[in-house]
Amino acid sequence: FGGTMKKRLSVLLLTLAVLLSGCSKPIDTTENSEKLQVVTSFYPMYLLAQAVTEGATELELRNMAQPQTGCLHDYELTISDMKLLENADVLIINGGGMESFLEQAMERYPDLVIVDTSHGIELLEEEEHHHHHEGETEEEHAEHSHGHDHEGNPHIWLSPERAAHQAEAMAAALGELDRADAELFAANAEAFHRAAHELEEKAHHIDIPEGECSAVFHEGFAYFAELFHMENVFGIFADEYQMPSAKELTEAVDEARGHGIRFFLTAADNGRIYAETLAAEVDEAIILLDPLTTADEENLSYLERMEKNIEAVEKHWKEETE
């Protein structure tokens, strides 16, 4: 992507648009009423919302998609999702085109307050995919959106600084609806932003030369390449529907050799085998990173999991330079 970024000015759906009929007052969260029911679309938003709402007494936080769902590309609402949203006051989404079911949810639940946390955040341009359906022509591949919003890369939670802005958007929105906890939300978001900034500083102090080449095998890891000032040469994204062809893999090996790529960033998913194959061709090791899209056994926080990712890159670089 060469550092190119694109401003996405999506609509912050909280802004009274869904509450124009005089319902824009704070939702009553006194002890005589039910608590504010807050739902997050998927696990990264749940992790951020946990940080923002820690210590709050007037809301209940639930996550919609199952903890092992992963990204929400092409996700369809289940019966249990619909039941959860029917009883929810607020739905917090990542935005940026991640939640393909959003229009359906808005139509089905017109009174649901939807907080789009991508509002005003700069998205990286979406990577040129190095995969397509077997037998597709290039024209068909270009038309095959695979459920993505091609205005930008929506995996913004993998940038600590952007995630901090998402947390602040959550705090501001929830504070308008739950005035009793508004100061708490703001303080939590501020503390999160400070910690996220420290993570970014830790990444920058690893002292990887600017412009070091990388290849990513998960779309979200373009944000990691940016964090470490890497030049991302290509991306290979595989799933159960799409796999890279032999020709594409051969071309990728040539690119890896030609650019001297030393950073192969992958998750423990379908892309891992391709990352390992290409890395082995140039006598390198993969860097296994956590996209934060699923629950982990240790129940770690967003900040803890991101710190482990940064440490994984640091460990790889130390081994490279020993």
Where on the chain are the PLM-derived regions?
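Hydrophobic alpha-helical segments with strong N-terminal bias
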Residues: 6-9, 78
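Extracytoplasmic metal-acquisition and chelation regions
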Residues: 22-322
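Sec-dependent N-terminal signal peptides of Gram-positive bacterial secreted proteins and lipoproteins
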Residues: 8-26
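Short, Lys/Arg-enriched N-terminal segments with co-localized hydrophobic residues
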Residues: 1-4
